[in-house]
Amino acid sequence: MTYGLILALVFGYLLGSIPFGLLLTRAAGLGDVRKIGSGNIGATNVLRTGNKGLAAATLLLDALKGTAAVLIAGHFAPETAVWAGLGAFLGHLFPVWLGFKGGKGVATYLGVLIGLAWQVALIFAVIWLAMAFLFRYSSLAALTAAVIVPIALYFLSAPQIAVLFVVMSIIVFIKHRANISRLLAGTEGKIGAKG
């Protein structure tokens, strides 16, 4: 791995590690989002505060971390864009500022995808929205989309980055293992539910 790739990975990690969900809820006087609901710092848990605007802002900013990392690194050296995106994804999952305990990575995953293959990002968004509308489970929507993305990349857009998204999708599944257990048990919280 060259110096440039390492630099892109570190840059992406630092950008991805900004915990927007935590920062926004604290700034709004809602306390520590890690102490409510699932304890996650992502948009779905921020929504459990009852503040839809903050949840939307968290979703947008967490996605932008991934997109910005890809586009900025790619501007200077196109071959580093993928590594910056991976760094942003890992930074969101394992932020140094929070003892390496971050979010589940779905919004940042989408942001990286927007930067690398926006057409497939649209497929992700359509699948997520359809599953969320039909079943009201954010986790199920995310997991379904994460299965489809590497396949879509391979056949429709960018087979050279499909392997990256296979790895990222596996990590998304690992981070959602508790959600998967709750889905199977019928106890998973639905979108918009407080607590």
Swiss-Prot record:
Superkingdom of origin: Bacteria
Pfam family, one: G3P_acyltransf
Subcellular location as annotated: Cell inner membrane
Transmembrane segments annotated in the record for this chain: 4-24, 53-73, 80-100, 110-130, 133-153, 154-174
Keyword Membrane carried by entry: yes
Reactions the enzyme catalyzes: an acyl phosphate + sn-glycerol 3-phosphate = a 1-acyl-sn-glycero-3-phosphate + phosphate
Lipid bilayer topology: Multi-pass membrane protein
EC code: 2.3.1.275
Similarity comment: Belongs to the PlsY family.
Subunit structure: Probably interacts with PlsX.
Its biological purpose: Catalyzes the transfer of an acyl group from acyl-phosphate (acyl-PO(4)) to glycerol-3-phosphate (G3P) to form lysophosphatidic acid (LPA). This enzyme utilizes acyl-phosphate as fatty acyl donor, but not acyl-CoA or acyl-ACP.
Name of the protein described by the UniProt record: Glycerol-3-phosphate acyltransferase
Organism: Mesorhizobium japonicum (strain LMG 29417 / CECT 9101 / MAFF 303099)
Gene behind this protein: plsY
